[in-house]
Amino acid sequence: MFPIPWSPLGWTFPKGGNVHAVGKTYEGGVPLAEVVRSGFVEGVHRGSVVALDATGAAVAKAGDVTSPIFPRSSNKPLQTVGMIRAGLRLADSADLALVSASHEGEDFHRARVGGLLARAGLDESALHCPPDLPADEEARAAVLRAGGGPTRIQMNCSGKHTGMLLTCQAAGWPGEGYWRSEHPLQERLRAAVEEFTDEPVAAVGIDGCGAPVLAVSLSGLALAYLRLVQAEPGSPERAVADSMRAHPEIVGGTRADDSRMMRAVPGLLAKVGVEGVIAAAVPGVGAIALKIDDGAGRARMPVLVSALRRLGVTAPALAVFAEVPLLGGGRPVGAIRSLW
């Protein structure tokens, strides 16, 4: 029995609920990646993907790329643009990259978040994101060995939440309730997402960090990333793209997929979102957005590599990401690879 009213056209929530959605829902995708062990296909990951050329025209697509999804953290660069437009000013481009980050909680991430808060006269108690351990396995193990536990700064969205608080200070808005969808900050961020995706937000939910998450289509998400990398130098959107590409390790981490991909492919902007989402763009080439339906992050990179190759990106370093090894007895016995 559904605890919330439902209709074939989408979820509808009563006033005061956590989400409001109107319009069609995501229909699901097609087989995009296969899991091959010892020569035997033991699984398939379905999903949707769209590749746009440098003009914004779709040159390849599969699955449902026009219905709304929650891009999750792939929306962060667009939200950062909204923060800059609302008054956020950060002299260090690495700090700007941190606002767009889903950082893995390594030492340098935690130090940078703490420094931003301290310079603003704040501490982590001002953050609405929940306490967490670092996402990076080595960083998490080090924290636990030292007797530490979950903190808000370690949570992977703490950079975004810090940016939101600093934006409120700059704009003269109250910090209280900055995460609520009706706060003037969130209204500005929603406007930025709608502008760059060229479509209205179809649903507003609550992300894992407690801030609003905005639903748009994969086509809209890809268009937004294309606009980020092809924006005029000096514009807020170009500043966001440039900061992320200049500091890829800040965006994710030493071992994060999007960080590794940006280090490997010149000019590439990439940002993952949980539930199997990633968006990427290369100036003068095009942009990609994809979602793996079952949320498996392991299938993202092989499909992204396939999409980049369809756009003519031939960087030799792509080969490292084209297949994800499967182990048996501690040695490779198969791989996850793209079907698209």
Question: What kind of region is each of these model predictions?
Answer:
Residues 41-46, 75, 272-274:
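Short, flexible loop/turn motifs enriched in small residues
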Residues 19-26, 94-201, 227:
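Active-site-adjacent helix/loop patches that line small-molecule binding or acyl-intermediate pockets
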Residues 19-66:
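Beta-lactamase-like hydrolase cores
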Residues 183, 200-245, 249:
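Penicillin-binding protein/beta-lactamase superfamily catalytic region
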